[in-house]
Amino acid sequence: MYVFLKDIVPAAQNNIYTRFIILDKAKPGVAASGKSCLALAADETAAVHIQLWGEECDAFEAGDIVKLTNGIFSYVRNSALVLRAGKRGKMEKMGEFTIAFVETPNVSEILWNPDPGNSKLYIQNGVTSPYSRIFPPLP
């Protein structure tokens, strides 16, 4: 069963099954670990930043409906909070242009702190911005 984007929380586990539409994609960059790019994705409940690696950068475009299995929502290099396939996950194109979506809230813009009662869990501690600061909404 798919989880809505509004319900994902940071974790160091590959356990997210979801689907979304890619709204926008940044130009790929090349680092020591290979090619990567960020994308803005959304479903009917929220938006999120997606990290695409290697061939994923070329495989997906704005308007694509994507299914993510065994995804992970975590900080990349202790800075950006992104949803990604990781080493054990998989992204697959399901179709194009046939899904309702919202651009707010953007769950990548939520501030999260470790739960004092359980260090494996995170709790919300505020919102940096309701919209993506990387992919600002059109006026």
Task: State where each predicted segment sits.
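OB-fold nucleic-acid-binding modules
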Residues: 1-30, 56, 77-139
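Hydrophobic residues positioned within well-ordered beta-strands of beta-sheet architectures
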Residues: 18, 39, 68-69
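OB-fold (S1/OB) nucleic-acid-binding surfaces
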Residues: 21-50
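A short beta-strand motif that forms part of the nucleic acid-binding face
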Residues: 43-45, 54-56, 72, 85-87
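Short acidic/polar mixed-charge low-complexity motifs
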Residues: 46-48, 64, 79
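Short nucleic-acid-contacting surface segments enriched for D/E, G, S/T with interspersed K/R
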Residues: 54-70
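Short, charged beta-turn/beta-strand-edge "cap" motif at the junction between a beta-strand
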Residues: 71-77
